[in-house]
Swiss-Prot record:
Subcellular location: Virion; Host cytoplasm
Organism: African swine fever virus (strain Badajoz 1971 Vero-adapted)
Oligomer and partners: Interacts with host TBK1.
The protein's name in its UniProt record: Structural protein A137R
Record family assignment: Belongs to the asfivirus A137R family.
Cited function: Plays a role in the inhibition of the host innate immune response. Mechanistically, promotes the autophagy-mediated lysosomal degradation of host TBK1 and affects IRF3 nuclear translocation to block type I IFN production.
Keywords per UniProt: Host cytoplasm, Host-virus interaction, Inhibition of host innate immune response by virus, Inhibition of host TBK1 by virus, Inhibition of host TLR pathway by virus, Late protein, Viral immunoevasion, Virion
Induction: Expressed in the late phase of the viral replicative cycle.
This protein's GO CC annotations: host cell cytoplasm; virion component
Keyword Coiled coil: no
Protein's GO biological process: symbiont-mediated suppression of host cytoplasmic pattern recognition receptor signaling pathway via inhibition of TBK1 activity; symbiont-mediated suppression of host interferon-mediated signaling pathway; symbiont-mediated suppression of host toll-like receptor signaling pathway
């Protein structure tokens, strides 16, 4: 099987960008629904300075997600599923960032948890999450 790469026209670029915006909105909604919390616990925005799509959580979420043991795995798996990209756990804060290329297409999602990580050795070695690739076009 052969893959043929073609340059996207303006309409295709716009459609792809819209798809990723919708995916982020859907992620936000699913996380809020999954936690069954009446108030919104996360919001997403495009940071024009850093050129990153960010999914930001309120401080209340940092404690709320502990009440749902499956929440961390659910979020990681869902983000991998919708993006097809690598998901990395790191850092002291709980912020999702999505780096974008020049077309606004995400290339990486960093998932930072403010929480107790069970195995810090795995975290430091970067062994927690595997890599997934997708073909876009």
């Amino acid at each position: 099987m052969e893959a043929v790469l073609t340059k996207l026209d303006q309409e295709e670029k716009k459609a792809l960008q819209n798809f990723h915006r919708c995916a982020w909105e859907e992620t936000k909604n699913i996380i809020n629904d999954f936690l069954e919390i009446p108030e919104e616990r996360c919001t997403y925005k495009f940071n024009s300075y850093t050129k990153k799509m960010e999914l930001l959580f309120t401080p209340e979420f940092h404690t709320a997600w502990h009440e749902v043991p499956e929440c961390r795995e659910f979020i990681l798996n869902f983000l991998r599923l919708i993006s097809g990209h690598r998901v990395v756990l790191k850092g002291p804060t709980f912020v999702f960032t999505k780096e974008t290329k020049n077309l606004g297409i995400p290339s990486t999602i960093n998932v930072d948890f403010q929480a107790n990580i069970e195995n810090m050795d795995d975290l430091q070695k970067g062994n927690l999450i595997g890599k997934m690739n997708i073909k876009e076009g």
